[in-house]
A protein has these predicted regions:
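Generic N-terminal targeting/processing segments that precede catalytic cores or assembly contacts
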Residues: 2-352
Length: 352
């Protein structure tokens, strides 16, 4: 697989391999903020309500690219250990592909079903989140802030970001919360919906916002911000939809309402609305970047489902045991932020 972007990001390892990690090109002289990095890693860590019981230390081990806590200009190579592996959980179903998981297409492509999802596992979002934390540091010095919240879990919805007036203070406050929602009531109801799961799973939607991008950042065609952001968002397991601004609501709009009018207020160019989500023609327009990422319900559930036995080629049933997230959107939030941060940093690097 080719590395991603100007930073040549590459993620290696699997869900049940001894190690996993990443390599990426990082400018020389970045003093790594360990507190920031560990905070972002903790936000995707298991242990929260609705997440897998799998426990890993998730401590970054620096192989190269760092001297005395500062990047030295060499390729940054960071790895993590996989210690809490239970491959035996998959032995009973090794010929039964889990519905809507990677199992069947991976079996056809590679000749086997990868243990724990292999390279298709959400475990690989750990190095992605680490890379995003490094990007957050670099972008912070450029005045860029990124934050997010759970917009929807099951049938419970949170208040949306104000598309024109979301502040960096609000984004910072959300990042400090263990269960980031704008409305306290939404947090309570979402947690109740997750706690009520009995062997099933829930889908969810994360809303992200980025502030401080200079007007014109991005480009045309596949060099545009939407293209870059989407390509990384869809690298996150379970993501099935990515929307910008009004997103699918554009289908019911007239242009007279969809267009974001411009005004001069106090000598400053402003917008009357932000249906474009801060991006026009692949370039930042100065308004907040608003992105919504929808996650499917976790495919691995304990309820009986229809499948097939690949050995006997007969119909079969499967109830998945093992340790799985009840709602992958919960830990997917940190991965989504990382993807947005990396895509924005990549746009800056393209123009350097």
């Amino acid at each position: 697989m080719k590395p991603w972007g100007s930073m040549k990001l590459n993620i290696y390892g699997e869900s049940h391999s001894e190690l996993l990690g990443l390599t990426m090109e990082v400018p020389k002289g970045v003093a790594l903020d360990e507190e920031l990095i560990f905070r972002d890693i903790a936000r995707r860590k298991s242990g929260m309500i609705g997440s897998t019981p799998r426990r890993e230390s998730d401590i970054p081990i620096y192989v190269s690219g760092v001297t005395g806590g500062v990047t030295n200009g060499d390729i940054l190579n960071v790895r993590f250990e996989n210690a809490d592996i239970r491959s035996a959980d998959y032995n009973k179903t090794r010929t039964l592909p889990r519905p809507s998981h990677c199992d069947y297409p991976a079996y056809v492509k590679y000749g086997y079903m990868p243990s724990g999802g292999g390279r298709f596992s959400g475990r690989l979002t750990l190095p992605l989140v680490f890379a995003g934390a490094v990007a957050r540091q670099i972008l912070r010095d450029k005045g860029v802030a990124v934050g997010s919240h759970y917009l929807k879990i099951g049938n419970v919805s949170d208040s949306a970001f104000d598309p024109l007036h979301t502040s960096s203070a609000q984004l910072c406050a959300l990042r400090q919360k263990d269960f980031p929602t704008i409305s306290p009531e939404a947090e309570t109801d979402m947690k109740a919906a997750i706690s009520a799961l009995k062997g099933d799973s829930l889908g969810g939607c994360v809303e992200l916002c980025a502030l401080g991008l200079p007007v014109g950042l991005g480009g045309e065609l596949w060099g545009g911000l939407e293209s870059s952001i989407s390509s990384l968002m869809y690298a996150i397991p379970g993501v099935k939809a990515v929307e910008f601004g009004a997103g699918t609501e554009f289908a019911a709009m007239h242009g007279s309402l969809a267009n974001d009018g411009l005004r001069i207020n106090g000598g400053v160019i402003t917008f009357e609305s932000n249906n474009s989500g801060g991006i026009q023609a692949g370039m930042a327009n100065g308004a907040p970047i608003i992105v919504r990422v929808t996650f499917r319900p976790t495919p691995s559930i304990a309820l009986p489902q229809h499948t097939i036995d690949l050995d006997s080629m007969q119909n079969a049933d499967i109830a998945v045991s093992g340790r799985h997230d009840g709602c992958i959107a919960l830990r997917g939030l940190a991965a989504g932020e990382a993807a947005l941060l990396l895509a924005i940093l990549d746009a800056f690097m393209e123009e350097a």
